[in-house]
Amino acid sequence: MQAEEQFSCGVIVVAAGRGERAGQSSEGPKQYRTVGDRPVITHTLDVFATWDGTGPVVVVIHPEDEELFASARKRMGHMLDLTVVHGGATRQLSVLAGLQAIAGAGVKHVMIHDAVRPFFDHALLDRCRAALRNGAGAVLPAVAVADTLKRAQAGGLVAETVPRTDLHAAQTPQCFRLEAILSAHRQAAASGQADFTDDASIAEWAGIPVHLVEGSPDNFKLTLRRDLSMADEKLTRMAIPDVRTGNGYDVHQLVEGDGVTLCGVFIPHDRKLSGHSDADVALHALTDALLATCGAGDIGDHFPPSDPRWKGAPSHIFLEHAARIVRERGGTITHADISLIAEAPKVGPHRQQMRESLSAMLAIAIDRCSVKATTNEKLGFVGRNEGIAAIATATVVYASGGDA
């Protein structure tokens, strides 16, 4: 069996529909309508363009849409080699045209996807690929039906309630062994079977077991005009990054000792910082800054000084805890900045080691970690060498629409 990194799938993107239910538009069928500043089909193709399992790609379009597709292709965010073929009078015939075009491309598996489902992701593609690797001949992503279903009768009356147990809503991409689904499509065409609504139905008809994998609630099909409006709103929201900045401040008293710990780095000195933990004033300030980006309180809420467990504790525990909370809430730490205010010891000789320490604790690149130091010009308690203060700023990007 192929190794996962070598297991690629041919892709057929079905884009030959007319989309009457979405209403007429000067932009053409719904796959060419603009959502999030680009045609729908470009969002769909970009997902495949950035997935590591994408093999040969065939796009099936309507014969009248060549100019529309050529224009849309120029708007793609990523390069993608693809073949364009013309579809038939029905979706079923369009898919058959795509299968026949990809049959000589040297792939054993194929994914068939609706162009008007732009909100699938790599995780869904990975689940489909894993099922194919495990030997499935047909794979269907689907979501369990959550709504109560009613069967209607004449006059707009309810005839019965349909039990929803074991019912699933089918999605795409639907994935198959290429040889098997091509044969099934050819058999269906030869026998005059032309009323299948998806490719999994053809596989079922041909006796191919269809394996379910978890779909995605976001992977909805753009069918009606309101779907296009929802898609535009969703893509617009996704395009605006949720960037948050948190600030933190801390100060600790200097007492007789043999050194101070700043940013997790011990610096020999004739004094030390007094505190319940190791009194790393820099990490305490940065911990508060991270917690502030998601409204998670402050360091005292999570590690109260009255708790003996934290007596003498290394402060990297506090910072890593805050970073974990940020990530659990969908945040990506993009920058950390610390300003130390002290008369002594000199921070400059240790600055690079401090940045390396922060980089390791936060699991971010060192160029995203900044440490600066200044004196207080002999003014105040810092100027009298009675303590060290720290001001920290954390920048975090949260997943748009996520809870924080």
From Swiss-Prot:
Binding residues for a divalent metal cation: 250, 252, 284
Pfam family of the protein (one): YgbB
CDD domains, A to Z: CDP-ME_synthetase, MECDP_synthase
Keywords, in A-Z order: Isoprene biosynthesis, Lyase, Metal-binding, Multifunctional enzyme, Nucleotidyltransferase, Transferase
GO biological process: isopentenyl diphosphate biosynthetic process, methylerythritol 4-phosphate pathway; terpenoid biosynthetic process
Protein residues bound to 4-CDP-2-C-methyl-D-erythritol 2-phosphate: 250-252, 276-277, 298-300, 374-377, 381, 384
Start and end residues of each stretch annotated as 2-C-methyl-D-erythritol 4-phosphate cytidylyltransferase: 1-243
Catalyses which reaction(s): 2-C-methyl-D-erythritol 4-phosphate + CTP + H(+) = 4-CDP-2-C-methyl-D-erythritol + diphosphate; 4-CDP-2-C-methyl-D-erythritol 2-phosphate = 2-C-methyl-D-erythritol 2,4-cyclic diphosphate + CMP
Cofactor(s) the protein requires to work: a divalent metal cation
Family: In the N-terminal section; belongs to the IspD/TarI cytidylyltransferase family. IspD subfamily.
Name of this chain's protein: Bifunctional enzyme IspD/IspF
Organism, as annotated: Sinorhizobium medicae (strain WSM419) (Ensifer medicae)
Source organism phylogeny: Bacteria, Pseudomonadati, Pseudomonadota, Alphaproteobacteria, Hyphomicrobiales
Gene: ispDF
